[in-house]
C-alpha cells in the first residue's frame, strides 16, 4: 500500500502566501487535481498571472470539460494519482484531440510509485508536492515556452 507524501493543506498554504515573480501568459491551462483545496490554490496562483484556467477534480471530469471546451488547451497540469482515471490515462486520451498540448505532472507520491504509472522525471515534466508558488509558476512557464514537439 502506497500513501501520498502528504494530503494535508499546509503544502498549498505556501502557494497563497508567497510572492510570485514568474512571467505569466494568456495560455489555456487545464488543472486536474482531486484535492479541492490544492486545485483551488493552483488555479488561483496561475489565474493571477493571466492564464485562462479550466479545472477538474477527476479524470472523467477533465474529459467532460474538454469535450465541451471550444478552444485549444495549451497545457495540462495533472496529478498522477487520481480516483478513477489516473493522470497518465487522462493525458493519453486528451492528446488524441490536442496533439500539441504540453504536459506537467504533479504528485505527492515518491518516485517508485510514480514510475508504476509510466512517469519518469527524466523523461517528462514532473513537479513533486509540496511545491512553492514560485516553483509552480516557473515550471509552468518553462513547459509552455518549450518549442513544439520538445521531449525531455
Q: What does each of the following model-derived ranges do?
A:
Residues 1-30, 117:
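Disordered, acidic interdomain junction associated with two-component signaling
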Residues 14, 88-89, 93-129, 133-142:
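Alpha4 helix (beta4-alpha4-beta5 surface) of REC/receiver domains from two-component response regulators
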Residues 33:
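Conserved acidic carboxylate
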Residues 39, 60-67, 92, 137:
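Alpha2 helix of the CheY-like receiver
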Residues 40-48:
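Charged docking surfaces used in two-component/phosphorelay signaling
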Residues 50-61, 65-66, 127:
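Short hydrophobic/Thr-rich beta-strand motif most characteristic of the beta2 strand and flanking loop
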Residues 58-61, 83-90:
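Acidic catalytic/metal-coordinating carboxylates
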Residues 79:
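Active-site residues of response regulator receiver
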